[in-house]
Amino acid sequence: MSAPCHCKHAEELTDTFSSSSLSYTNGKLSVLSPELQAEFQDPNHPANLICELCRLFYDNNWVTGTGGGISIRDVDGPNPNLVYIAPSGVQKERIQPWEMFLVELPDERIIRTPNDIPKELTKSYKYKPSACTPLFISCYTMRDAGACIHTHSQHAVMMTLFLENEKEFSISHIEQIKALPKLKYNEETKKIEKIGSMEYYDKLVIPIIENTPHEEDLTDSLQEAIKNYPGASAVLVRRHGIYVWGETVWKAKVYNEAIDYLLELAVKMKLAGIPLVKE
């Protein structure tokens, strides 16, 4: 991976706020604390990783027109219950680390918003929480995920159109399936556990849920799909896109890339009249 964001926000922070100390005005951060400086300059911090991945996903045509979203749980930090979420309505290729919403699990309490950050950085823009937030939270609470990705991949949308009357997408006997985890529900722990990786002969099954006028209204359907498909690491949303999660941000990235590859291939197979599942 290259340095996050491919921009100079870290240097700008050092130049502009190197002597800042923490203070509040009417409950808002009025100057940038040393802690926030360190956070925004750490290339492996979740806020910076979201920026890096947003730019990569934008280049892949997955999050254009402010669509899509990414969230990362700080699994390696002092508080693994903290979740960083990209805001709603921002251009993903220009997103900055200080634009994230910070939510704490399990009570979903908002710890920090971009509106708490000094206006020198945010230019007085009024940020809104991502409409994907309740869906991201569902992935964290139901699957103990470390990251959740939502894209508007055209391959995902096209495949749900090919399967207009179907409730799931299936494909088998494709090498790329090996990149995805083999999951199983543990009756004793009542949790989904990874028992290895999928194999060439395995059949990948991803549930499809129906789209709704508002993103947050997808929550119940997403939760139902997660419950009914314990072996899935993703949920397709018809005529909309896909949600993908993983135990870490890098696993989620790999799963998303592998699934998108399989969806693109599946679209071509459909057009060529080739069955997606080999008997």
Curated annotation (Swiss-Prot):
Q: Name a biological process GO annotation.
A: L-methionine salvage from methylthioadenosine
Binding-site list for Zn(2+): H150, H152, H240
Q: What's this protein's family per the entry?
A: Belongs to the aldolase class II family. MtnB subfamily.
Species name for this entry? Candida tropicalis (strain ATCC MYA-3404 / T1) (Yeast)
Superkingdom of the organism of origin: Eukaryota
Cite the Gene3D superfamilies for this sequence: Class II aldolase/adducin N-terminal domain (3.40.225.10)
Q: Name one Pfam family in it.
A: Aldolase_II
Per the entry, what this protein does is:
Catalyzes the dehydration of methylthioribulose-1-phosphate (MTRu-1-P) into 2,3-diketo-5-methylthiopentyl-1-phosphate (DK-MTP-1-P).
Its predominant location is: cytoplasm
- What is the designated name of this protein? Methylthioribulose-1-phosphate dehydratase
Membrane-spanning intervals of the chain: none
